[in-house]
Each structure stands twice: as structure tokens, then as C-alpha cells.
């Protein structure tokens, strides 16, 4: 009992809050991206069956990579794995944005997410005392749920005309103004880049 109480009184290390923010932005971008890609496929006039296949390909990446990603997360520096995971995500977003096969490149985003997940939890166990892991995991899961909701809401706004209008009003000095879904894809990439910065903070 004493150990539990002592652990409950411990403050989380500063690095945990950085990891928490990184998880928030990463999951936020993942969920927003799904909405943006669905809108993109609809506007391109792609076959309706491609929309459910997006999520299938994303999830399949977890299943296929499961035997390897855990061992990789244990054997490599966590921040390096998380950086590589988001580089893969950004590459996937780029491929979709320029019109390449959305199923293939969204699956690459899923691969990035599959790499990120065990590295995130591995890093958490290294920085958080054992007596605080339950609390830390609870905060991570709370951030994930909140970012899933926020990502869907943001994704819906990012594909709207009002978002482009807002960007033009806020940044009239830009040498170019984003059009169509380019602003939405760029916003997703920016969230991934923020996550990378937080990873190395």
C-alpha cells in the first residue's frame, strides 16, 4: 500500500508530457487524414469499394508488421523509430496528394502507425516509474480517444471551402494560396512534423 501511495505522489517526468502531446498530434493527424482521403476519393469519382479498403489496408499493416515491430522497438532508439514512422506517414500523404494509388500509400501511413505504436509505449516505460505506468497509460489512451474525435472534426473542416477562405484571410502574404484539398493534406503533414519535433524535444 505504501509503495502504491508513494508512486501515486510522484510527478510524471517532463518527457512524458512531451510524449503525450506527440501522441495527441499524431493520432489527430491519422484520423483527420482518413476523412481527407475519403473526400479525395469521392471527388475523384473513384469506385465506392475503395473507401472501406482504405481502413482495411491501414489495419492490415498492423497485422503484417506485428511480429517485427515489437522487436525493432526494443532493439533501436525509440526516438529514431518514431521519426522513421512519421517520415513514412509523410511519404504516404505525399503519394496520395499527388494522385498515386491511394490504397498503397494509405497502407504506408498504416505501416508508419504500426511502427510508432510499440516505440511509443516502449519509450513510456523507460521514462515513467513503474508505479506510475497505469496512470501514464490512462493519459495516453485518453489523448488517443480525444484526438480521434478531434481529428474527425478537423478533417471535416479541412475539406470545406471555409477552411480555404480562413487560410487566405490569415496568411494573405503567402506566395501561393492552397487550392482544393492541398491545404488539407498540408495541414496533416504539419501535424506529423509537429509530432517529429516533439519526439526530439
Question: Where do the protein language model's features map onto the residues?
Answer:
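Transmembrane alpha-helix termini and helix-breaking/packing motifs in multi-pass membrane transporters
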Residues: 36-43, 95-98, 150-186, 191
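Small-residue-rich packing faces within the transmembrane alpha-helices of Major Facilitator Superfamily
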Residues: 90-91, 189-196
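Alpha-helical transmembrane segments of multi-pass secondary-active solute transporters
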Residues: 51, 81, 136, 183-187, ...
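C-terminal ends and interior cores of transmembrane alpha-helices
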Residues: 87-101
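Primarily residues marking transmembrane-helix entry/exit sites
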Residues: 12-20, 48, 99, 103
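A helix-boundary/kink motif common to multi-pass secondary transporters
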Residues: 46-47, 77-78, 129, 163, ...
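Extracellular/periplasmic helix-loop-helix junction of adjacent transmembrane segments
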Residues: 36-62
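Substrate-agnostic recognition of the 12-TM MFS/MFS-like secondary transporter fold
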Residues: 17-34, 55-89, 105-160, 198-201
Amino acid at each position: 500500500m505504501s509503495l502504491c501511495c508513494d508512486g501515486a505522489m510522484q510527478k510524471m517526468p517532463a518527457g512524458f508530457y512531451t510524449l503525450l502531446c506527440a501522441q495527441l498530434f499524431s493520432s489527430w493527424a491519422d484520423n483527420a487524414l482518413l476523412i481527407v482521403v475519403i473526400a479525395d476519393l469521392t471527388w475523384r469519382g473513384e469506385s465506392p469499394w475503395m473507401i472501406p479498403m482504405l481502413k482495411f489496408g491501414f489495419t492490415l499493416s498492423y497485422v503484417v508488421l506485428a511480429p517485427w515491430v515489437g522487436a525493432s522497438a526494443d532493439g533501436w532508439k525509440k526516438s529514431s523509430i518514431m521519426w522513421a514512422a512519421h517520415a513514412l506517414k509523410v511519404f504516404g500523404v505525399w503519394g496520395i496528394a499527388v494522385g498515386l494509388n491511394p490504397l498503397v500509400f494509405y497502407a504506408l501511413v498504416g505501416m508508419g502507425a504500426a511502427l510508432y505504436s510499440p516505440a511509443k509505449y516502449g519509450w513510456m516505460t523507460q521514462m515513467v516509474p513503474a508505479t506510475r505506468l497505469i496512470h501514464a497509460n490512462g493519459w495516453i489512451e485518453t489523448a488517443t480517444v480525444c484526438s480521434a474525435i478531434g481529428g474527425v472534426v478537423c478533417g471535416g473542416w479541412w475539406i470545406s471551402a471555409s477552411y480555404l477562405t480562413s487560410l487566405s484571410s490569415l496568411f494573405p502574404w503567402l506566395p501561393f494560396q492552397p487550392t482544393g484539398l492541398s491545404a488539407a493534406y498540408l495541414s496533416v503533414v504539419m501535424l506529423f512534423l509537429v509530432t517529429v519535433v516533439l519526439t526530439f524535444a
